[in-house]
């Protein structure tokens, strides 16, 4: 039995406008053949293997999204919250320390939450092969059999064969120029670096202590400040912030004598761009990938994503069109790496479209800002069963609530009232109020805010529950 360690950090900025800093690609459903998000799919493709409860590494901003997606998938997990991003070596170290505290030196399978794998059986076969190496005290990494001279991936140069499909590691190679990548592909001796690993927790920590002692030390100190908060595991903030920022490749794998690479040919992709997503998606006879409501005429090799509005495309070739509730991307499929520049521009201007979608997820449910104008704003709010918002008050706005479905238990200036479908309630300016869903189905209501100042910082509240 082994423990999956799922790294759920990262911003996925090249998949904007679908992926945003507050809701990046690992939490999206990008596979047209599945309803699972990428995080859920990462867990799903392990089904049938002898796995223990996963450890998921996330951050404060995404903690409720992680917890809710795993809950909806029907699994339990341990969620470690990093105080700040410090790359993969410290993150994996926290997971290894956590695993050793709770189990007797388990084998860890380290995976990214935002990868795509087409062939589940080939993926699991490679894991079984790597597990044998891990049990023998090796640090196994997965090398992806390359299909193109990709310049966006790092490479692993394999050495002598250890067993069939498993090799010693000669070297790790940075992202190459095209002519070098073509040589790598022709040689048959190089793999794409997947960034996924399998090893015993103790073996990894011993090698980390030897080759990157400062990372080991700061993570060990951070674990001494460990605390539990509902589903979450928090570590000492000050100690972790002193930890060097380094990848597992630089911190351990390039130095260890215990490394091996296991060959994997499973239709893997890190889905790092819209063109990469087009590559791995099912296509129609004209090479188009369509999700949502799209009508095409004379169009080929395009990616069309239209979940909210009808998108009509005429005479297009090699174009990406992505429609969301508050932004639309139109791009040449061969230049989609430049989307990152758009994201940088949005960030510099502090645009909301950089940070989050119009529909925003909260600890208690979600809120969709469906309309706004001079002195008013309209939200469609969903409160999950058993959840409630914090007790709060606003200085500049009043609120009108109309229940669409479900039952609301409202506390207003200490008075409790239950309202149901087609009933409404008025919350005056300066009134303490709280809404709760005591029922068994989601509570949906329309909230109309009115007043002279409608920004989110006009709120005095306790912590969301």
From Swiss-Prot:
GO terms for molecular function: GTP binding; mannose-1-phosphate guanylyltransferase (GTP) activity. One of its GO terms (biological process) is GDP-mannose biosynthetic process. It comes from the Bacteria. The keyword Transferase applies. Its EC number is 2.7.7.13. The keyword GTP-binding applies. Pfam families: ManC_GMP_beta-helix, MannoseP_isomer, NTP_transferase. InterPro entries: GMPP_N (IPR049577), Man1P_GuaTrfase/Man6P_Isoase (IPR006375), Man6P_isomerase-2_C (IPR001538), ManC/GMP-like_b-helix (IPR054566), Mannose-6P_isomerase_type2 (IPR051161), NTP_transferase_dom (IPR005835), Nucleotide-diphossugar_trans (IPR029044), RmlC-like_jellyroll (IPR014710). It catalyses: alpha-D-mannose 1-phosphate + GTP + H(+) = GDP-alpha-D-mannose + diphosphate. Pathway: Nucleotide-sugar biosynthesis; GDP-alpha-D-mannose biosynthesis; GDP-alpha-D-mannose from alpha-D-mannose 1-phosphate (GTP route): step 1/1; Bacterial outer membrane biogenesis; LPS O-antigen biosynthesis. It is an enzyme of class 2 (transferase). Keywords: GTP-binding, Lipopolysaccharide biosynthesis, Nucleotide-binding, Nucleotidyltransferase, Transferase. Transmembrane segments: none annotated. Belongs to the mannose-6-phosphate isomerase type 2 family. This is Putative mannose-1-phosphate guanylyltransferase.
